[in-house]
Amino acid sequence: MQIASKAPCRVDLAGGTLDIWPLYLFHSQPVTVNFAVDIYAKCVVHPRADARIVLESRDLNVKEEFASLDELRAAPQVRLPLLARALEYFSPEHGVEIVTESEAPAGAGISGSSALLIALSMALNKLTGHNYKLEKIREIAQNIEARVLRVPTGSQDYYPAMYGGVSAVELNVDGIRWQPLPVEPAELDARFVLAYTGEPRNSGINNWGVMKAYLDGNAAVQRNFDLIASIANEMRHALLKHDWAETGHLLREEWTHRRENVPGITTPLIDRLVCATRHAGATGAKVCGAGGGGCVLFLTEPDARERVRDVILQAGATVLPARVAARGVSWLP
């Protein structure tokens, strides 16, 4: 018997980084707004009759084996730490073979690692019979990722992977709540273009730099996040009203403030893309995730979408054939 699952990646619209504790506690009604895309992280878990552990990432072309879970735990270094730490936590009684594959380009900033951890944690949850609820799976996955990265991680990335669709993640003193937004996937599909700049980035480093600046009392960063928090709430209301002109404007404003937080969030190519697509009819653009390269989201009216796409290709970036993923983590045959 094998257990196979997949979970979608996400594109963040507004409010990112505020989902890292304790930053959201410093703002009134903090929220992040995002949507799931049909770029998937997949995993297959094969139980074994012996104690052997086999871990394989097909997109990274890495495979490693251990005689047992105890040997894995004792290993001074592993090449696939997300897989190893998740397996350590769920601790199956027998050996397993885990094969994963991510469709997200390297360093894309669309939470490929978070989607992978949700898919893998769901499969291991089923294998071991723990029967954890989705919110508990989110907590486990988030803590495993922080343990591997050794920097704080936010919560928003896991919700699109769990539930799909367009959503707001409310960040409150009494907990985190996921709220679906009634936006038809086709309505957003006709208005967004996702480009990959081919520049890997490290979200942990960029997010940590921003977070440290905030907590150290950097007034400019704190002011930027006051504005970003306000924009995220306005973005939510614009989506509820299906006001796409305002949504594009807010996306542009979000990026204007975000790019000022720390050096390295933007790049010359990203700046060229944002400028060129604006002239081609894009209503807004921002980097996905923490920045420093990776993917850039562009919003546009449907009649300008092809022009925007062409300009992106001419500038040397890649357009990813992404659509809204209406469904979150699911089982594969």
What residues fall within each predicted segment?
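C-terminal nucleotide
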Residues: 1-14, 18-21, 25, 34-35, ...
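Surface-exposed beta-strand/loop patches in extracellular or lumenal glycoproteins
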Residues: 30-32
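Short, conserved acidic/polar surface loops in the N-terminal third of protein domains
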Residues: 67-68, 108-112
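Conserved catalytic cysteine-centered active-site region
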Residues: 92-98
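Short pre-catalytic strand/loop immediately N-terminal to key active-site residues, enriched for Gly-Thr
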Residues: 104-108, 283
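DPxDG-like acidic metal-binding loop motif
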Residues: 110-134
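Glycine-rich active-site/cofactor-binding loop and its immediate structural neighborhood
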Residues: 293-295
